[in-house]
A protein has these predicted regions:
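Hydrophobic cores of alpha-helical transmembrane segments in multi-pass integral membrane proteins
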Residues: 1-8, 27-53, 64-91, 98-148, ...
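Long, contiguous internal "core" modules enriched in hydrophobic/ aromatic residues
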Residues: 8-22, 201-204
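Flexible, glycine/threonine-enriched loop-and-boundary segments that flank and lead into catalytic domains
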Residues: 20, 55-64
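Individual transmembrane alpha-helices with interfacial aromatic-anchor signatures
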Residues: 153-163, 399-408
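Post-cleavage N-terminal segment of exported redox proteins
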Residues: 186, 190-193, 197-254, 371, ...
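Electron-transfer interface patches adjacent to heme c in soluble/periplasmic c-type cytochromes
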Residues: 223, 228, 269, 286-408
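Electrostatic cytochrome c docking/interface patches
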Residues: 242-266, 278-281, 285, 310, ...
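The canonical Cys-X-X-Cys-His
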Residues: 261, 267-276, 326, 412, ...
Length: 425
């Protein structure tokens, strides 16, 4: 008989804790564990955001940006940092200059990511809830878009703090790596190390996947076929769009001047803060108008749907405001919307339109399938100048003293006033 008091139960040691000592002492292992943790978080959140109800809340908000950075900074960033801390001492045959500094980098990096992500998540959920808030009468609770911007401005400060902390950690990495290289011996001694590979499974280079890895030509051809098939699947719907759009629903293409304005819109990065895609949900319809349709983007190359709404959607902006409003808005956004956080674009008022390039642009779009007339193709420059003169005359009648008939602001106004005005269903 055994006495119960003499029996000691020792639970089995989980295999993943075999290196727990290193996890406590080695910053490199800590970086890898943190990277995998952030990867797991981002991987879980991705499918979560694919759920229709969740996506309708988070789409176009800061939440999506936070989600992307969780993987970019946490997974890619920390994995890279860990690899650098590991490989640099190996390459220079020395020890890492300061493990303590690497640990500090780890923790301020984690803190920075958490500050950034949590602030973006909170801002995104706030935006989504405010945009979709509808009262008992079926009206928007926050009809003025800028109300939703003001509410999340304090969270911008936390986001900035998170970014500063992450960058500070990166500076520590650079300094640590620099000092590690500096302390390396001047004459590097190469050592030949024999390593015995122990494996319970014998490796047969002529079997299975090992054999496939050695067939470079066959592997290249198979990869090329896969890429071509994927490309065709993506491109085919665009090339066959006419099959899906009724003739009476087709839209008019942008005029040469509007095309120039569209290029300015893209060049200045307007698409990073504004979308041009109205969703089929009640709040989007109340705020912006009818949902976007396929034909409205059929001549957009590339499309300007956007992925974030720091500012409102512009899909149906055309004719909503007079030309003077757009002029003042570009010169000084605070002149028309006091709480606006949009930057000013005063150089558009003084920079000239490159009229000479318009004919080539129109010809290129025509080759891509945009149905421009022979007159547009042969006389694009003069047609653009005529339209610009009309807009400049309207602005002059509304109080603008400068002659802007050849300025970029005129082309941009022409483009903005054309949005949602080209026909369609």
């Amino acid at each position: 008989m055994y006495s119960a008091s003499t029996i000691k139960y020792k639970p089995p040691r989980p295999i993943f804790l075999a290196g727990e000592f290193l996890l406590r002492t080695d910053p490199i292992i800590k970086f890898f564990v943190a990277a995998i943790t952030f990867y797991a978080m981002a991987t879980f959140e991705g499918p979560l955001l694919s759920i229709k109800a969740v996506n309708s809340l988070g789409h176009y908000t800061d939440w999506i940006v936070g989600h992307v950075h969780l993987g970019t900074l946490g997974w890619n960033g920390f994995l890279t940092f860990g690899m650098l801390y590991f490989i640099v001492p190996k390459l220079w045959n020395t020890e890492l200059y300061s493990k303590k500094m690497a640990n500090i980098h780890l923790w301020i990096g984690i803190l920075g990511i958490l500050f950034y992500y949590v602030s973006m998540l909170a801002a995104g959920i706030t935006q989504g809830l405010m945009w979709r808030a509808v009262d008992a009468n079926g009206q928007l609770v926050y009809p003025d878009f800028v109300e939703t911007v003001i509410r999340i401005i304090p969270l911008f400060l936390f986001r900035a703090l998170g970014g500063v902390l992450f960058l500070a950690g990166y500076v520590l990495l650079l300094y640590n790596v620099y000092k590690t290289i500096k302390q390396a011996p001047k004459e590097l001694v190469e050592e030949t190390v024999q390593v015995r590979i122990s494996s319970s499974t014998p490796i047969h280079p002529e079997r299975g996947h090992r054999k496939l890895e050695g067939m470079a030509a066959a592997f290249t051809i198979l990869a090329l076929i896969a890429i071509l098939v994927g490309s065709i699947i993506e491109i085919a719907p665009t090339l066959s769009i006419n099959k899906y759009v009724k003739t009476e629903n087709k839209v008019e293409p942008f005029t040469p001047l509007e095309l120039a304005g569209r290029d300015i819109y893209v060049k200045e990065g307007c698409y990073t803060c504004h979308s041009q895609m109205i969703r089929t949900i009640q709040s989007d319809g109340l705020r912006y108008g009818a949902a976007s349709t396929i034909e409205e983007s059929m001549y957009d190359r590339p499309f300007q749907w956007g992925s974030k709404r720091t500012g409102p959607d512009l899909a149906r902006l055309g004719k909503k405001y007079p030309d003077l409003w757009h002029y003042m808005h570009m010169e000084d956004p605070r002149a028309v919307i006091k709480e606006s956080i949009m930057p000013a674009y005063p150089w558009l008022i003084t920079s000239k339109i490159d009229f000479d390039s318009l004919q080539k642009k129109v010809s290129l779009f025509n080759k891509l399938g945009v149905p421009y007339s022979d007159e547009d193709l042969s006389d694009a420059n003069n047609r653009a100048k005529e339209q610009a003169k009309k807009i400049a005359d309207v602005l002059k009648s509304q109080g603008v003293k400068e002659d802007v008939s050849d300025k970029k602001i005129t082309a941009l106004i022409a483009y903005l006033q054309a949005l949602g005005q080209k026909g369609g269903e």
